[in-house]
Design a protein with these regions (language model features):
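Conserved, mostly hydrophobic/aromatic
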Residues: 7, 15, 36, 116, ...
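Terminal or standalone catalytic/regulatory effector modules within metabolic enzymes
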Residues: 35-55, 286-296, 300-467
């Protein structure tokens, strides 16, 4: 029986997060938004993930203004965001009142679909966000963080899918952020999950890093998947996703037709091609990110993590150490209970791998985040961590066994009080909650711009500014 396959376009979020460390500006998006809205996509993934942090930290943009702008220009297409469960859009666990408020404000400002995931596939870390999305009338799509390792059988993922369904999800996504899926594994996994929870639509998300993405998507559709994540061709391949146009063409005229017209992509493709050329010329897009690297199947490193690792090593003048760091990543992952590599665990494991290589002595220097991961502060790892390794890393520190957020008191009112002088919109407290220093810097720049102050010329000590 024929069924229309849903296509989610990632150009406005994950594609540029994977290729250029999330540096696409709202101004660069504006000329193409109206055209994207006319294509007929199931959804546009345009917000969440690292975009929030990047807007505030690097682009001097208000992420909420970006969301409202995209909503205004795309009234006919569902807008989608990536949400890290109890980690929200930040890198630690937040109290339930913060999680609920971020979900509420996201939907109020235009988000339709919230793709919620937990880096450890710990359902305890997802329930608050799922309930909040249900309450606000949003679509809660819960993502399974796909990875490989001794415990990660089809049965493991089926059991997790059942828990996701029981928690109130509206759909499920297989999120293969590290491009570890193979075509045959995709087929078996999709069949197993669809058989276990046939009532929930199943979306497929994979990256092109290892060169297998298009084959995986095709096998997944044939096995029963209902939707695909793709990227417009100039922002596809490499550490990004399968090209949208190629998948539309591959499924055209089959029982899995997407209903999209290939001719409609011409203007959009041309526009993003000019952006791609600009990014390459400026050095923002490293051509290495566009290459196929089958070693991803060995190193288990997601696209966004790979581009950020390369960026970090360049800044440290240690670019030649990339292969050593990539080889160290799976070893650190094994030591820390086989966490799937997705934010924030990808950053935690990646940074620890960098430290291990650069210092020349493994674990002689550990980040607080890595210690927290080993101590259970992010949830229960898929595999138990060796008690001797735990003692080596955290000493006699107490290990958290339950839901980490249960240790947290409500935060919102306290946070509002701390930034009362800076608040210009309800959402500002969420920026401050997730990125305190970055948000304060942004608030100050915003205030200065409104009163005509150039922060570079302001003498803060004497509170003097030249006219």
């Amino acid at each position: 029986m024929a069924k229309k396959i849903r296509v989610t376009e990632t150009a406005l979020r994950d594609a540029h997060q994977s290729l250029i460390a999330t540096r696409m500006t709202t101004e660069e998006m504006l000329p193409v938004l109206d055209k994207l809205d006319k294509i007929g996509y199931y959804s546009l993934e345009c917000w969440g993930g690292a975009t929030y942090d990047s807007c505030l930290r690097f682009l001097n943009e208000d992420p909420w203004d970006r969301l409202r702008t995209i909503r205004e220009h795309c009234p006919n297409t569902k807008l989608q965001m990536l949400f890290r469960g109890q980690n929200m859009l930040g890198y630690r666990h937040y109290a339930d009142d913060c999680v609920e408020y971020l979900v509420q404000r996201s939907i109020a400002n235009g988000i339709d679909i919230i793709r919620i995931f937990d880096a450890l596939n710990d359902i305890k870390n997802l329930k608050t966000a799922i309930k909040a999305a249900n309450k606000e009338g949003g679509h809660a799509q819960v993502a399974i963080s796909y990875t490989t390792g001794p415990v990660f059988t089809d049965e493991y993922y089926v059991e997790y899918a059942k828990r996701i369904a029981d928690a109130g999800a509206d759909s499920i996504c297989i999120k293969d952020m590290a491009a570890l899926l193979t075509p045959t594994r995709t087929e078996s996994l999709v069949k197993a999950i669809k058989a276990a929870v046939p009532e929930l639509p199943l979306q497929l998300h994979t990256h092109y890093t290892s060169g297998l993405a298009s084959m995986c998507l095709l096998k997944g559709v044939e096995a029963g998947a209902d939707g695909l994540d793709t990227a417009i061709s100039p922002l596809a391949l490499g550490t990004s996703h399968a090209p949208t146009e190629s998948m539309v063409a591959a499924l055209s005229g089959t029982e899995f037709d997407t209903g999209l017209d290939l001719k409609q992509f011409s203007d959009i493709r041309a526009y993003f091609m000019t952006l791609r050329e600009k990014y390459i010329k400026s050095g923002l897009l490293d051509p290495k990110m566009l290459a196929t690297d089958a070693n991803a199947l060995i190193y288990q490193v997601p696209g966004g993590m790979l581009s950020n690792l390369l960026s970090q090593l360049k800044q440290a003048g240690k670019e030649d150490k990339l292969d050593e760091v990539l080889a160290e990543v799976p070893r650190v992952r094994k030591d820390s209970g086989y966490p799937p590599l997705v934010t924030p665990t990808s950053q935690i494991v990646g940074t620890q791998a960098v430290f291990n290589v650069i210092t020349g002595k493994r674990y002689s220097m550990c980040t607080n985040e890595f210690k927290g991961l080993v101590a259970g502060e992010y949830g229960t790892t898929p595999m138990p961590i060796d008690p001797e390794f735990q003692k080596k890393i955290i000493g006699d520190k107490k290990i958290i066994k339950g839901r980490p957020a249960d240790q947290l008191e409500p935060e919102l009112d306290k946070l509002r009080g701390e930034i009362e002088q800076w608040i210009e919109q309800p959402e500002d407290v969420l920026s401050y909650a997730q990125f305190p220093k970055v948000a304060l810097d942004f608030f100050e720049k915003r205030r200065n711009a409104k009163v005509g102050i150039n922060g570079d010329k302001l003498d803060k000590k004497n509170m003097v500014h030249p006219v």
